[in-house]
Amino acid sequence: MKKLLVIVYPDMNDVEYTNTMVVFGFVKELQTVIYHPNLSTVKGSNGVTLVNQITSKVNLEEFDGVFIPGGMGATKVLDHDQQLLDTIRYFKDHDKYVFAICDTPNVL
């Protein structure tokens, strides 16, 4: 089974997060773990999505890749969060999958 870390952050795009998570849910060989190091609840930019099953401690070596939804929060929040950027950098530096949508690649 493959394991994917899903980084969430305030003002991420609701549609990009929810639609992608629905697709991931159809993949029986994929386990997703929702992650933010400091927040227990994250609200999407449109106020439609409220994520509250967030893990704050993970062993990055256990994951095959990372997914980061986009949206306005990418440049407002993610771009200034060194801990999250270091987490994403780990996947790049270890030749693991990095999936990013919309504005997130601009931050990376």
UniProtKB/Swiss-Prot annotation:
SUPFAM superfamilies: Class I glutamine amidotransferase-like. GO terms for cellular component: cytoplasm. InterPro entries: Class_I_gatase-like, DJ-1/PfpI, Prot/Nucl_acid_deglycase. It comes from the Bacteria. It holds the Pfam family DJ-1_PfpI. This is Uncharacterized protein MG029 homolog.
